[in-house]
Amino acid sequence: MPDQKLQVIRGLNNCRQQHQNGVITIGNFDGLHLGHQKMLEKMHSEASRLNTQSCLMTFEPLPREYFSRDDSQKDNPDSSRLMSRIEKIRTLADFEDSLRPDYLLFLKFDRSLAGMSAVEFIEQILVESLKIRAVIVGDDFRFGCDRKGDFDLLSDYGDKYGFSVSSIESHCIDDHRVSSSLIRGALINDQLERADTMLGRPYTICGHVNHGDKRGRTIGFPTANIHLRRTQTPLHGVYSVTMHSLKHGDVAGIANIGRRPTVDGARVQLEVHLFDFDESIYGEQVCISFQHKIRDEKKFESFDGLKQQIQLDCQKALGLLKNER
């Protein structure tokens, strides 16, 4: 069996013999929510039963991103992803042993893969390249050009080539099927608690701390500027948050995520003001967990007006933090 640490493989060309003959699960896995975790748990148990390795196969970009590459979707929150590639890697690596795959395989979703038929996908990728022994999929799994492949087709070819196929029923909460789109909608509509329940953890965004324009420092509220590897996010506004840092641990604060209309921001940015904290964190990789929505973004006529509002926002965030203790 391979080492328990997650190994990331970028492309089939980097797969070696030791990556073959395993158990695989396939999908977008955007958010790695409770439904995804059921699939990972099943994959892990099947790999243990067969005494082989487990592999999660996913795609970059996500197929829906590939098929909606025009500019009309770039500012649409409904088209935003829940997690970046780096966040997906980090989340999987942090999962407990019963959920964490041995390998994470990224396939580049391009014209070639988009045009591959379901049968070609099975024979060329699953059989010839990976020589899989078992595959775990969700009950709504579709694959191949025009999404013509389904569980029945996969099972038929499993019988032909000697691999087993298992389907996992959707995970439901209050009679609603947990899905990435449902979580995205909850976040857009300020239902953080509902989103967190479906994720099984607080919604979190990770990134490096960059040097910003330091406007916050001039009004008494220095901020950490988190580099976002995305043009859109399901969250917009001001939130109470917790910053997670390997060096500094957990630090409470308040965050604004959006386009900063007071300074005519052109792109989505995440800025975090940390309470009772004056350490330098430039260049660090941090994760920001969102707890409560404070308010929507708004444009202020002056920086004095912005400063007064931030003071009120901090008071509210601290009050929420105190109530949670």
What are these regions (language model features)?
Residues 4-14, 105:
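Short acidic-hydrophobic, aromatic-tinged amphipathic segments that line or gate anion-handling sites
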Residues 10, 56, 106, 167-168:
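A structural preference for short, hydrophobic beta-strand core positions in alpha/beta folds
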Residues 14-81:
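N-terminal catalytic cores of NTP/NDP-binding nucleotidyl/phosphoryl-transfer enzymes
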Residues 33, 92, 135, 195, ...:
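Residue-level signal for inorganic ion chemistry
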Residues 65-139, 143-161:
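N-terminal Rossmann-like or analogous alpha/beta NTP/dinucleotide-binding catalytic cores
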Residues 150, 158-258:
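Glycine-rich, Lys/Arg-enriched anion-binding loops that position phosphate/diphosphate groups
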Residues 212-325:
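Phosphate/ribose-recognition catalytic cores of enzymes acting on nucleotide-derived substrates
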